[in-house]
A protein has these predicted regions:
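Conserved Switch II/interswitch segment of TRAFAC-class P-loop GTPases
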Residues: 58-60, 65-70, 79-131, 546
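Conserved catalytic-core segments of large NTP-driven translation/proteostasis enzymes
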Residues: 121, 138-299
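Residue-level recognition of beta-strand microenvironments
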Residues: 11, 203, 220, 242, ...
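Residue-level signature of catalytic and energy-coupling elements of molecular machines
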Residues: 13, 19, 38, 62-64, ...
Length: 640
C-alpha cells in the first residue's frame, strides 16, 4: 500500500483538527491542554485508507499542525516531511495572518501538491461562500495549489482544487476524500532503497516497551533489529520494534509515519530535532552552504544577521553569511553559508525555513546544497561556482565538482555517501561513469592529478640538478616536499613509471636512465677511497685522513662516501667504523672455517683470529650478531 503524508496548514480555529477527525475518526489533539483550550498546541497524527481513481489503495498519514502564531515552530516540526498539504480556510473568516504564513512556508519547503478546503461552509450563505472561494482562488493563483499551473486548459471553476465542507454536518467530506485520493495518487513514491533517515518529532516511554520515538520516515527502510545512529550525538541504538500508523510491523518504508521502540538509549538522551539514520555514513554539521530565498513581504536580510533556522524537526539559531553580497532584498535569492548554533544532520537537497530573529516571523527559506563546506576559506567566486554546479547539474557532475574542489588531496570513497546522501553502490556507479582518477580509495580530478604529477617530476628533476652524485631521491623526502597523501602519491608514482617518466628502485625515485654523473676528479676520488679501504682490511683507516687527501672538496667527498655506502661497497658497522665489503666477507669465511673445530668464540679468541683491538672487536661482533653470523650466549658467541 502506497503511503502519502498529508500536512494541514491554516490559521488558528479554522477547523484543521476537526476536519482531520471528520475524515479519519481520529482526534489528533492528544494533550489535555489542547482539549481543555480547544486549540492545537503541538503536532498530532491520524491516518486514513483511501482508494485512488485507479483502484489502488492509499494510506494517508495526516500531520495536524497548530495554527496559533505562538506555535508556528511546532507547525514547522511537523510539516517538513509532508508530500502534500491541505490548506484549511474557514468560510466565515477567510484568509488570515497564519493562513498566509503557513502558505508561504509550504511554498518555501517546495511542497508541490495539495488542495484547499473551505471549512465551516454551513456557517455562511451560498453567496458569501462564493465570495470566499473567489478570494481564495486569487490567493493561490500561480502557486502549487492552482491547478491551472498543471493544466492551463482547465476552466476557471476547476483551476484551483477548492472544496467547501463542514466537519459538523459532513457536507463536502466525500468530495474532500475524492480530491485527496486523486492528488495522493499522483505523489511520486519515496525511495525505500535510499539510506534511511527519520527526523524525531516525539519521544516518550511506554510501559513494557521502554523508549519510543516517532517521526516521518523521509527516506529508506528501517527494520526490526536494525542498528541506527543518533544525530547529532553519534550514539548507536538498536530497533527493538516498529510500528507504522499505530500497528506493529516488521519494517517501515519511506513516506510512512513511524514509531520505533529503541534499546541502547534512554529517554533523557533523546529530543525532538534529533535524527536517526544509517550507521557509519553521515556526519553532523554546524555549517551548510545553501540557496536562500527571501519572501517578498520580508525586510532585507543583512550579511551576518541571526535567524531562527528550521529543517524537518530541527530548530536552532543560525548566522547568515552571504557570498558576495551585503544583503538579500525582499523577493530575491542568494548563496549563503548558515552557521548553526547547534549541530544537526543536514544533507544536500534538504529544505529549510528561516524566521526573523525578533520579532519571530517567517521571512524565507531555501535548500541545502553542501553540508560539508571546507574549513579553509576559498575565494567567493570559486565557492559560488561550485554551488551553481551542485544546484543545477547531474550527480556525476556534482561528484566531479566535489572531488575537484579538494585539489590533490582528493576525496575518499567512504566520505561520498555521507556527503552526497548516496548508497555505496550508487557511488561506485557514478565513479564508473566519470573521468575521475582513482588512487586506491581516493578520487582525484584529472586536472589535479596532472598538476600533482608535474610537481613530482619537477621536484625529482631539481633534486638531480642539485645532487649529481646521488642516484635518486627518497620516496619519503619526495612525498614530504610535494605534500601529497599516501594513496595519491602512490598512484602518481605508478602512473609515472608506467609512462616511463620516472623510475623507482627500492626507496629511491629518479628520472629514467639517470645514474650518478661524476666529473673526472670525482671518479678518481671514488676509486682512491675504495682502494684505501680494500687494502686496509679490518684495520680501518682514519676517514678524515682519507678524505683530506682527495682532490675534491669535503662536501663532494662526503657524497662519494654516501654513494659507496648505498652501493654496499663500503659497509658501516657503527657510527665510527666503516669497512670494505671484501674485508667483512673474508671475516665470515674465517668464522665458518672455525666452526668445524670451535663452534663458540669469545672476545679474546676473536681478537686473536682477526688481529684487531677490543675497540674494533666489540662493534664487529655486534655487527655479526645483527647479520646472524653469530649469536651471543653469555660472554661467548655461537657461530651459526
Amino acid at each position: 500500500m502506497k503511503s502519502v503524508i498529508v500536512g494541514t496548514a491554516g490559521h488558528i480555529d479554522h477547523g484543521k483538527t476537526l476536519l482531520v477527525k471528520a475524515l479519519t475518526g481520529i482526534d489528533a489533539d492528544r494533550l489535555e491542554e489542547e482539549k481543555r483550550r480547544g486549540i492545537t498546541i503541538d503536532i498530532g497524527f491520524a491516518h486514513l485508507d483511501l482508494p485512488a481513481p485507479n483502484g489502488e489503495m492509499l494510506r494517508l498519514g495526516f500531520v495536524d499542525v497548530p495554527g496559533h502564531e505562538r506555535f508556528v515552530r511546532n507547525m514547522l516540526a511537523g510539516i517538513g516531511g509532508i508530500d502534500m498539504v491541505v490548506l484549511v480556510i474557514a468560510a466565515d473568516e477567510g484568509i488570515k495572518p497564519q493562513t498566509r504564513e503557513h502558505f508561504d512556508i509550504c511554498r518555501l519547503l517546495s511542497v508541490r501538491r495539495g488542495m484547499t478546503v473551505l471549512t465551516k461552509s454551513d456557517a455562511v450563505s451560498p453567496e458569501m461562500l462564493e465570495v470566499v472561494r473567489l478570494e481564495v482562488a486569487e490567493f493561490v493563483r500561480g502557486s502549487f495549489l492552482d491547478l491551472s499551473q498543471i493544466d492551463p486548459g482547465k476552466t476557471d471553476s476547476a483551476r484551483a482544487p477548492i472544496v467547501a465542507a463542514s466537519s459538523l454536518t459532513g457536507q463536502g467530506l466525500d468530495e474532500v476524500k475524492a480530491a485527496l485520493g486523486k492528488i495522493a495518487s499522483e505523489v511520486p513514491a519515496k525511495n525505500a532503497a535510499a539510506l534511511p533517515r527519520l527526523p524525531v518529532d516525539r519521544v516518550f516511554t511506554m510501559k513494557g516497551f521502554g523508549t519510543v520515538v516517532t517521526g516521518t520516515l523521509v527516506a529508506g527502510t528501517i527494520r526490526k533489529e536494525d542498528e541506527l545512529e543518533l544525530f547529532p550525538s553519534g550514539k548507536r541504538v538498536r530497533v527493538r520494534g516498529v510500528q507504522v500508523h499505530g500497528s506493529a510491523a516488521e519494517k517501515a518504508v519511506a513516506g510512512q509515519r513511524t514509531a520505533l521502540n529503541l534499546t541502547g538509549v534512554s529517554m533523557e538522551e533523546l529530543a525532538r530535532g534529533m535524527t536517526l539514520a544509517t550507521v557509519n555514513t553521515f556526519r553532523s554539521t554546524s555549517r551548510v552552504d545553501a540557496r536562500l530565498s527571501l519572501l517578498a513581504s520580508a525586510k532585507a536580510l543583512k550579511d551576518g544577521a541571526r535567524v531562527h533556522f528550521h529543517a524537518y524537526t530541527m530548530e536552532t539559531i543560525a548566522e547568515v553569511r552571504l557570498y558576495g553580497a551585503k544583503q538579500i532584498r525582499p523577493g530575491e535569492d542568494a548563496f549563503a553559508q548558515l552557521r548553526l548554533a547547534e549541530p544537526g544532520l543536514l544533507l544536500p537537497g534538504d529544505r529549510f525555513i528561516v524566521r526573523q530573529f525578533s520579532p519571530v516571523v517567517t521571512i524565507g527559506g531555501g535548500m541545502v546544497l553542501d553540508s560539508a563546506p571546507p574549513a579553509r576559506k576559498r575565494r567567493i567566486e570559486d565557492t559560488v561556482a561550485f554551488l551553481k554546479v551542485v544546484m543545477d547539474s547531474s550527480p556525476v557532475e556534482s561528484l566531479a565538482a566535489r572531488v575537484a574542489r579538494r585539489g590533490a588531496a582528493g576525496l575518499a570513497l567512504d566520505q561520498i555517501p555521507g556527503e552526497m546522501n548516496l548508497r555505496r553502490d550508487e557511488v561506485e556507479q557514478l565513479v564508473r561513469g566519470s573521468t575521475l582518477v582513482r588512487c586506491g580509495t581516493v578520487l582525484v580530478s584529472p586536472r589535479a592529478f596532472a598538476d600533482a604529477s608535474g610537481r613530482v617530476i619537477e621536484t625529482v628533476t631539481k633534486f638531480h640538478a642539485a645532487n649529481p652524485l646521488v642516484a635518486g631521491m627518497s620516496k619519503e623526502e619526495l612525498r614530504d616536499q610535494v605534500r601529497l597523501g599516501a594513496e595519491v602519491f602512490s598512484g602518481i608514482l605508478s602512473k609515472a613509471v608506467e609512462e616511463k617518466k620516472l623510475e623507482v628502485s627500492g626507496e629511491l625515485v629518479r628520472l629514467p636512465g639517470r645514474g650518478v654523473v661524476m666529473k673526472d676528479e670525482e671518479a678518481e676520488s671514488k676509486k682512491v677511497i675504495e682502494q684505501v679501504f680494500r687494502a686496509a682490511g679490518l684495520k680501518v683507516p682514519a676517514l678524515k685522513e682519507v678524505l683530506a687527501g682527495l682532490k675534491v672538496d669535503r662536501v663532494r667527498a662526503q657524497k662519494i662516501m654516501t654513494l659507496l655506502l648505498r652501493d654496499k661497497v663500503l659497509i658501516k658497522v657503527s657510527e665510527e667504523l666503516v669497512f670494505h665489503q671484501n674485508a667483512l666477507a673474508e671475516l665470515r669465511q674465517k668464522l665458518l672455517a672455525l666452526k668445524a673445530t670451535t663452534p663458540k668464540i669469545d672476545v679474546a679468541r676473536f681478537k686473536e683470529l682477526t688481529g684487531v683491538s677490543r675497540k674494533y672487536a666489540i662493534p664487529l661482533l655486534e655487527y655479526l650478531d645483527r647479520e646472524r653470523v653469530t649469536r651471543r650466549v653469555g660472554d661467548e658467541r655461537v657461530i651459526l
